[in-house]
Amino acid sequence: MLGVINRMAKKFNYKLPSMVALTLVGSAVTAHQVQAAETTQDQTTNKNVLDSNKVKATTEQAKAEVKNPTQNISGTQVYQDPAIVQPKTANNKTGNAQVSQKVDTAQVNGDTRANQSATTNNTQPVAKSTSTTAPKTNTNVTNAGYSLVDDEDDNSEHQINPELIKSAAKPAALETQYKAAAPKAKTEATPKVTTFSASAQPRSVAATPKTSLPKYKPQVNSSINDYIRKNNLKAPKIEEDYTSYFPKYAYRNGVGRPEGIVVHDTANDRSTINGEISYMKNNYQNAFVHAFVDGDRIIETAPTDYLSWGVGAVGNPRFINVEIVHTHDYASFARSMNNYADYAATQLQYYGLKPDSAEYDGNGTVWTHYAVSKYLGGTDHADPHGYLRSHNYSYDQLYDLINEKYLIKMGKVAPWGTQFTTTPTTPSKPTTPSKPSTGKLTVAANNGVAQIKPTNSGLYTTVYDKTGKATNEVQKTFAVSKTATLGNQKFYLVQDYNSGNKFGWVKEGDVVYNTAKSPVNVNQSYSIKSGTKLYTVPWGTSKQVAGSVSGSGNQTFKASKQQQIDKSIYLYGSVNGKSGWVSKAYLVDTAKPTPTPIPKPSTPTTNNKLTVSSLNGVAQINAKNNGLFTTVYDKTGKPTKEVQKTFAVTKEASLGGNKFYLVKDYNSPTLIGWVKQGDVIYNNAKSPVNVMQTYTVKPGTKLYSVPWGTYKQEAGAVSGTGNQTFKATKQQQIDKSIYLFGTVNGKSGWVSKAYLAVPAAPKKAVAQPKTAVKAYTVTKPQTTQTVSKIAQVKPNNTGIRASVYEKTAKNGAKYADRTFYVTKERAHGNETYVLLNNTSHNIPLGWFNVKDLNVQNLGKEVKTTQKYTVNKSNNGLSMVPWGTKNQVILTGNNIAQGTFNATKQVSVGKDVYLYGTINNRTGWVNAKDLTAPTAVKPTTSAAKDYNYTYVIKNGNGYYYVTPNSDTAKYSLKAFNEQPFAVVKEQVINGQTWYYGKLSNGKLAWIKSTDLAKELIKYNQTGMTLNQVAQIQAGLQYKPQVQRVPGKWTDANFNDVKHAMDTKRLAQDPALKYQFLRLDQPQNISIDKINQFLKGKGVLENQGAAFNKAAQMYGINEVYLISHALLETGNGTSQLAKGADVVNNKVVTNSNTKYHNVFGIAAYDNDPLREGIKYAKQAGWDTVSKAIVGGAKFIGNSYVKAGQNTLYKMRWNPAHPGTHQYATDVDWANINAKIIKGYYDKIGEVGKYFDIPQYK
């Protein structure tokens, strides 16, 4: 059970994951139950640990309710949440609501919009809306958006001297007269409700809608804001692009309680919104934000109820972070500002916050990254001011637009395109909105079904409606997703069972309701009488009949899904080509003996084992075949005309002695059906890859709609005379042949590479380029030019700028005596500037004056495969070609006379640099420091047995059918960084070859130079060891140390620094295992695991299960084994040996036992009963199922959350002081020694290490 090991109190409410219990022995460790909720830390800047799972689920559900994207509902009846009220609005004498002060007064003609009025509510969040005009009925939309720059990376374009932003006095005008007052609380029981809906009007060219609201008076002059208003720009629907593995931590005030929003820009002129998001997802451990915005889209990338890592340790627990993606023309920039303002106003409105600029006093709800740097610290970035100024725009203008958007959404000023009343008119007879039902409103999730009675009160759009609307949807079964109680009335929200389309709210007394459990997948055959009715839904009515069972006598019903409604079981399946639901009472299990013999043999396949697996291949159906099968259980297939065509194969299935392929249309998701293996010509296929290559092709060559296409799939023929240009954009390997997709003369299609002429490859040589590279000369282009150069920053320089327009540069000392890539060049005035890029991440750093640099031309990288000897006198291995002494990875002495394996080369000015590997490190060496080997006499040694598991380190290498052969070699790209289990070794011509098994089970030969005994990756943290140690030592709850056994005291700075010193730890053979990647299986042989598990109780001989679990869920095998051994007392605990829970009591002698080997859900109050209950619910009736199922839980819960080493769990170097799993400074050391001990006993070593590096 979780937590049976050392319940000591050194965690201070940090959550310790269940899987970390593997090493929870020794000092200061606590294993809380896996499903226990995390509590918020009381650590000032670290109050960001995820709230309880129930709170999280409730919050996600509530958020989803207000973010449900809907279609345009103008003039359409739609479902609304119970919180939405539709007030009446009066039509008064009107004037033009176009902004008049500092804004053009031209009338803007647009679509007729709904009138709007609103009341505010401080007791519940306001539903998000993205409409900048009067919001339409049910403007529940999704959120999105962010741009990617690592806040913790010092090498960023954002890092600009804060002094470059003038701290002008805060304009009093920004404290607008429209500033939303705090909502007034009512004394009555009915909660106040904010509404964004109004009577929807159909779109037409009718008169402009009228409103009694005042017009907005801009507080700053802005031609761009005027352009936005005059053109009545609309914000796009917010898209959601969430990533499951992003961590979810609460803000310092709790889940769903941000304090404001921060304006960022991406600092990358070349990026796109998709590129930024893609990069962020791959590097989220360093930084991720909530949303990205450009001129066309708003994409929310992380739920705004939880914090993100975008603005430093102080700001992250407080603010929503949103990035502006760079645009390059006036209209696009204006749209992006409109989109950002609308998104920001939506967030403020949703979370009950009012716009309040923090730019000039460090207090408020709207911040720039610069303001966070200036007033809060934890970051030194100054965006977005430089980017905004480059478009003649300012933060004050953006804030004014946010404020206006907010006031429009809150119903305090007139929307754009409407008319306003010059003086409010008092109606002769007061008209007040319908008063909603009184009483407290409660809404809860529900998972049931209901049938609406013939006599009913109708469907309600909201539970506040006085009357429902008549409906014909009676005596049908619907799904129920919510219940709501308002006063004494109870309602159900009903929706279509199959599509999820919501119909509306119905009163409890108007339905027949039943509870329902969630459907589960099954694979079972039953016997069913002909004539039995099938239904479109479980518990269906006569209005939901899907059909009747045809035939005579009993038929076979193949069930694929099951659901319990109240106490009845319903199954979904197929019979004679018809599908539907039927009560289990009408089915007979075919496994049971029949009372009389059946003259015809029963379906033989139902008693055979079915195995199904994914497949990536292609197939052509033979002209003679057995037809297409709807399921592999079918006795006969249906005739098909889809013969002699190429289809994609997505699955293969084996049933009894038959093997089937599932074929689908190659270009669409349309499934064709199952075909027998003997009825097709099958070929393996690799996944298509994007390419950008030009070939020549002869006229008349056929193009096909699919790769390996047949005459029935011709897309056309190449026209013209003589060779034509074929521009390829995609490539796929089918068996051993390559096919390319491209365009020629306006026609597109696939063609075999054999019909294409490949451009000559560049020569691979270390010799100096044939043509001398011209010396770099300064040019002064009028616009920004893309260049390929490389530069060294001089020790004495004038500094770095965010843009060429910055008058004052930030100190550039940190970049001095270092080499960087140059990607852009621009003249400004009489000076020329170039944009330097980070060498490892290709992230722009900033602009330098060329006078501060030594610049050379940079050639194109060329692949090469050559082995060299490093000269005794050399300049070392560098991180970058033409690198300086500050960028040396290995000094000259460390690589002298060593073997350097080159993989690519590039020219820098007149020199050539090669990139390759030496001493297990990769980097650049000047060609002058290398000597090519002399030819050796061919020699071949006999192959000998050799058992060792290596790691494939060169994805550009190959594996071979026979060693030293170029005729049968295949790319290692798909196996890069995967284990390779070697069984033989052979030396041929001085090259060592290893024969072994790839991760997919295939046997192959690989060169020793493409393998490594271990794969170590070094990650730069961007901080010094002193800085991170100071953060840890300064936490409110101090790191702990035992100077006297059993007595805990606060650790001092030196204790922490010593414990965090990665250089020292990496040199220790045992402590190095702090850096072992726990999310990377090593393919340790099952035999070795079983040898180790001998005598370990029920875990004995479970090597196959641990191996399967590791491969399926990407978890280190030793880590899993260690965890299981500690949790089960070496496999002897009753929880591991198994039991059953009957009538809520544990029964250990039952026929069926359920096992729990990781202690999941084994809560302290009754660990055995709770743990067995969980195992029973999960179906773990064997030890192997408990191992595999438990591994899934562990992997999904913690290891994949980013902190995938013991060191990261303890110290979290990406965000020091936050989300750490222990307080004992020796915690990672103790656990690393334990894991190393297990490796030694198994007879293996760790293969994958991830080591943080400090400056």
Curated annotation (Swiss-Prot):
Catalytic reaction annotation: Hydrolyzes the link between N-acetylmuramoyl residues and L-amino acid residues in certain cell-wall glycopeptides; an N(4)-(oligosaccharide-(1->3)-[oligosaccharide-(1->6)]-beta-D-Man-(1->4)-beta-D-GlcNAc-(1->4)-alpha-D-GlcNAc)-L-asparaginyl-[protein] + H2O = an oligosaccharide-(1->3)-[oligosaccharide-(1->6)]-beta-D-Man-(1->4)-D-GlcNAc + N(4)-(N-acetyl-beta-D-glucosaminyl)-L-asparaginyl-[protein]
Disulfide bonds: none
Region span, Endo-beta-N-acetylglucosaminidase: 776-1255
Gene Ontology BP annotations: cell wall organization; peptidoglycan catabolic process
Signal peptide residues on this chain, from the entry's feature table: 1-36
Enzyme class at the top of the EC tree: hydrolase
CDD domains xref list: PGRP
Gene Ontology MF: a single term: mannosyl-glycoprotein endo-beta-N-acetylglucosaminidase activity
GW domain sequence ranges: 442-516, 518-592, 611-685, 687-761, 783-858, 860-935, 942-1016
Main function: Endohydrolysis of the di-N-acetylchitobiosyl unit in high-mannose glycopeptides and glycoproteins containing the -[(Man)5(GlcNAc)2]-Asn structure. One N-acetyl-D-glucosamine residue remains attached to the protein; the rest of the oligosaccharide is released intact. Cleaves the peptidoglycan connecting the daughter cells at the end of the cell division cycle, resulting in the separation of the two newly divided cells. Acts as an autolysin in penicillin-induced lysis.
Record family assignment: In the N-terminal section; belongs to the N-acetylmuramoyl-L-alanine amidase 2 family.
Name this polypeptide is given: Bifunctional autolysin
Organism: Staphylococcus aureus (strain Mu3 / ATCC 700698)
